[in-house]
Every structure is written in C-alpha cells, then in structure tokens.
Regions:
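Type III/flagellar export substrates
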Residues: 21-25, 43-46, 50, 70
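Basic, amphipathic alpha-helical hairpins
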Residues: 8-16, 30-42, 62-66, 83-91, ...
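…primarily DNA-binding HTH/wHTH and HhH modules…
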Residues: 110-130
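Hydrophobic, helix-rich cores of sensory/ligand-binding and other regulatory modules
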Residues: 1-25
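Short helix/strand-capping hinge loops at secondary-structure junctions
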Residues: 36-38, 69-70, 119-120
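Append "Primarily bacterial transcriptional regulators
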Residues: 46-53, 58, 62, 96-102, ...
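Terminal helix-turn-helix DNA-binding modules in bacterial transcription factors
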Residues: 64-103, 125-130
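N-terminal positioning helix adjacent to the helix-turn-helix/winged-helix DNA-binding module
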Residues: 21-29, 75-78
C-alpha cells in the first residue's frame, strides 16, 4: 500500500510539472506569435523551434492548451488586426493583407469573408459582423 501511495504521488508530481512546462511553452509561443504574426512566412515549425520542441509536439500541446490549432490562432490574430486597419482608415485591401502577413490579397479576402462573414470592403462600409 505504501509503495502504491508513493508511486501515485510521484506520478501526480510529474503530471503537474509537465502541465506547468506545457503552459510556459504556450505562453512563450503566444508572445512570439503576437510579436511576429505580420511575417508572412511565420510557421508552426518556426514557433516550435523558438520554444525548443518538435513541430508535432508543439502542435499537439498548442491545440490542447489553446482549444484551437496554430493556424486558427494565427488567422484569428491576423483578422483582428485587419479589422482594426479597416476601421482606422482607407488603406486598400491589398495593403492591409500585406500588413497582416498575407502573401496573396485574394486569399486574404477569401479568408476574411470566411471568418468574418463579409468582405473586407463590406466590413469597412459598415457590414461588420465579426
């Protein structure tokens, strides 16, 4: 019975440490993403490398801790910034796409419409749904 109790406590401690390390890694990754999301080449592999883990491990832990995938988080971050830019002025959609890290303005418009429920132009004109 004593050995069982010691083993249970050891496993509990290991799990707590593992969870804490995962949360620290995610905090570090989110800070990195938030500082680099406008880089059109930002990738899961790059962020995983920044946090010193494999891309597969990073992807699994990120999804589990954040309740969304890396791509979903990055897209959401970029769309939030795009909405700010659309509200602030009259930059063209292609300029905004480049500013938020999108390589292709047409794909940016497609993703914006898919995630926000309206085109960037409609959003600017007042059809703000997202």
């Amino acid at each position: 019975m004593y050995i069982r109790t010691v083993l249970d406590r050891a496993l509990e401690l290991r799990d707590r440490r593992s969870s804490s390390q995962g949360k620290d890694m995610i905090r570090q990754a989110v800070e990195y993403i938030n500082g680099h999301y406008t880089d059109e080449n930002l990738s899961l592999k790059e962020v995983a490398g920044y946090t010193n883990v494999s891309a597969n491990y990073f992807s699994a832990v990120f999804s589990q801790e954040m309740q969304q995938t890396f791509v979903e988080y990055l897209t959401k971050k970029r769309m939030e910034r795009a909405k700010e830019l659309l509200r602030q002025g009259d930059k063209r959609s292609a300029e905004i796409a480049a500013e938020v890290g999108s390589k292709d303005p047409h794909y940016f418009s497609f993703v914006f419409r898919k995630t926000q429920g309206c085109t960037p132009r409609d959003y600017r004109m007042g059809g703000r749904r997202g």
